[in-house]
């Protein structure tokens, strides 16, 4: 849970990209990153144990494709390694180090430097950070579409996951402006980050299998058994990648500027209406979330988002122009 909160804080720093100067943002991002890494050791082993269970079940309750006895033996060795690593708990020194890092960061907050000299109100405070996160995720997704899923490296998939997770954290911070619509985006982003998170863990398990030393007494059957195990894991990974890629197509269907323009309009409507207690009228962006009654589609095909698409032309450009004039 601590690591999740640290990631959320890093997403918040990225969201303030338009006004918090790069040096300040970079310094604090490194602090939060290093704090998370300090806490990651035993958690990483526990995550891989959970991934093993998703793939093959437990020793007592195996599941999935029936493993050859050689494959089952290899998985048993990997499981023992991970159980030993996961048993190591965080030391008092590590916890104290993280506490000191965060306390030091908190004392610096009053001295943070903002690019404009003041904290501006309005959605453009957040637009640059949102657009940057969305754009990076979209760029990496489009690379996969261009080169083909089978040619994408593990590092590229991991980057797509990181950007989807970051955008999800950022939209959670903004979800009050239109809960039903933004929850649909958040759910889709979670599906991408969870699916590619499993893929990443499965890749690490494959690496551990490859790192197991061969014995001089290993037979050809034992070597083939290891290869069959790797192929079994790879089939699961391909299904996860295909599912995540399909979700990413829905998330990144818009150009970054259009995505931010639409979110800016949502912000303005929320700020000028619902948040101030003004009468809740049906606007060009669709019904109030309380009236929607169902989850919206992140693609814009749902009722509310499709209405927003149809009306963020002149009205949306006017809203955005006003916001930019403030920034």
Mark where each language-model region is.
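Cationic, histidine-enriched alpha-helical/coil surfaces that engage anionic ligands
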Residues: 1-295, 300-317, 323-327
């Amino acid at each position: 849970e601590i690591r999740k909160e640290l990631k959320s804080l890093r997403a918040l720093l990225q969201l303030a990209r338009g006004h918090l100067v790069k040096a300040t943002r970079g310094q604090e991002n490194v602090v939060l990153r290093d704090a998370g890494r300090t806490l990651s050791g035993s958690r990483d082993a526990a995550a891989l144990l959970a991934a093993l269970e998703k793939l093959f079940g437990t020793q007592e309750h195996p599941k999935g494709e029936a493993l050859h006895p050689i494959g089952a033996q290899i998985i048993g060795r990997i499981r023992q390694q991970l159980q030993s690593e996961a048993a190591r708990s965080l030391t008092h020194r590590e916890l104290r180090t993280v506490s000191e890092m965060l306390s030091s960061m908190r004392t610096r907050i009053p001295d943070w430097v903002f690019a404009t000299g003041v904290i501006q109100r309005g959605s453009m405070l957040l637009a640059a950070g949102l657009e940057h996160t969305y754009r990076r995720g979209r760029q990496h997704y489009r690379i996969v579409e261009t080169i083909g899923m089978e040619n994408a490296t593990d590092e590229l998939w991991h980057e797509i996951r990181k950007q989807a997770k970051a955008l999800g954290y950022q939209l959670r911070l903004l979800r009050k402006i239109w809960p039903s619509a933004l929850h649909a985006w958040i759910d889709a982003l979670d599906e991408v980050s969870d699916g590619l998170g499993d893929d990443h863990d499965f890749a690490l398990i494959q690496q551990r299998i490859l790192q197991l030393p061969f014995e001089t007494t290993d037979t050809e059957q034992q070597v083939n058994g290891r290869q069959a195990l790797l192929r079994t894991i790879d089939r699961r990974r391909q299904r996860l990648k295909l599912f995540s890629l399909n979700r990413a197509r829905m998330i990144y269907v818009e150009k970054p500027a259009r995505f931010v323009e639409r979110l800016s309009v949502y912000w303005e409507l929320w700020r000028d209406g619902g948040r101030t207690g003004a009468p809740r009228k049906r606007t060009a962006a669709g019904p109030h979330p309380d009236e929607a009654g169902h989850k919206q589609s992140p693609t814009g095909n749902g009722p509310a988002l499709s209405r927003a698409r149809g009306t963020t032309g002149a009205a949306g450009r006017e809203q955005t122009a006003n916001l930019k004039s403030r920034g």
